[in-house]
A protein has these predicted regions:
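N-terminal "mature-domain start" segment
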Residues: 2-74, 178-181, 186-194
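Short, solvent-exposed recognition patches
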Residues: 34-128
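A short, solvent-exposed beta-edge/loop patch
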Residues: 16, 112-195
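Generic hydrophobic secondary-structure signal
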Residues: 2-12, 16-18, 54, 59, ...
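Surface-exposed beta-strand edges and their flanking turn/coil or helix-capping segments
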Residues: 29, 80, 94-98, 105-109, ...
């Protein structure tokens, strides 16, 4: 019986080996290209959907927005934009009207690690107390709160915090063109055929 299993294993290994459907590549995996997401249309929709001011931060050159989604924090709605930084780290900002004292509210084990001042705004820092938990900064922007979370370094967290503070809230009443459709100008508008 064992001999039969060995023969079957060898037959399968040889068959798969010749087809090239299986490969062995030791070493660290390489990251593929970052999938870029245009955050502007999402933020414009969110500005109409939620009851707090929503901002689109102007991030440093080399950063790529790669995710957008709505969520919940401390029982309140959130607007979330994720970025891959120029160094390849992931960092996201969550905007909400939940109270700063209730954040972060994801139930993950973090320890409060003091505060840092970014251009006059105090951000409370939380460091992970266990593996697979990201660090977090929470800032009160007055009319909303921002939660920065990710694998970025202090400089990248500071850059995103400053960008959030400088960003103006999106006007929910402003009409935004549909970016997926080309816009016609008055000179391009087709006229009715002459009779």
């Amino acid at each position: 019986m064992i001999l039969t299993l060995v023969v079957m294993f060898l037959a399968v290994a040889v068959t798969i080996g010749f087809t090239g459907l299986c490969s062995f590549n030791p070493g660290k995996p390489e990251n593929g290209p970052v999938r870029e997401v245009d955050a502007a249309p999402f933020v414009n929709v969110e500005a109409r959907r939620v009851d707090y001011p929503v901002r689109l931060p102007k991030v440093p050159e080399g950063w790529t927005s790669n995710s957008t989604r709505a969520g919940m924090a401390a029982g309140k709605q959130t607007t979330i934009i994720g970025y891959v930084t120029a160094s390849g780290a992931f960092i996201q900002v969550t905007q909400t009207d939940a109270e700063a004292g209730q954040l972060p509210s994801d139930g993950k084990n973090r320890l409060r690690d003091g505060t840092t001042d970014v251009e006059g705004t105090t951000w409370t820092k939380y460091e992970p107390a266990e593996d697979n938990v990201r660090r977090v900064w929470v800032g009160d922007l007055g009319d909303s709160r921002a939660i920065i979370e990710g694998t970025g370094n202090d400089e990248e967290f500071t850059q995103l915090a400053a960008a959030m503070q400088k960003a103006e809230p999106i006007d929910p009443d402003a009409t935004m063109p549909d970016s997926s459709q080309p816009q016609q100008t008055a000179s391009e508008t087709p006229s009715a055929p002459a009779k």
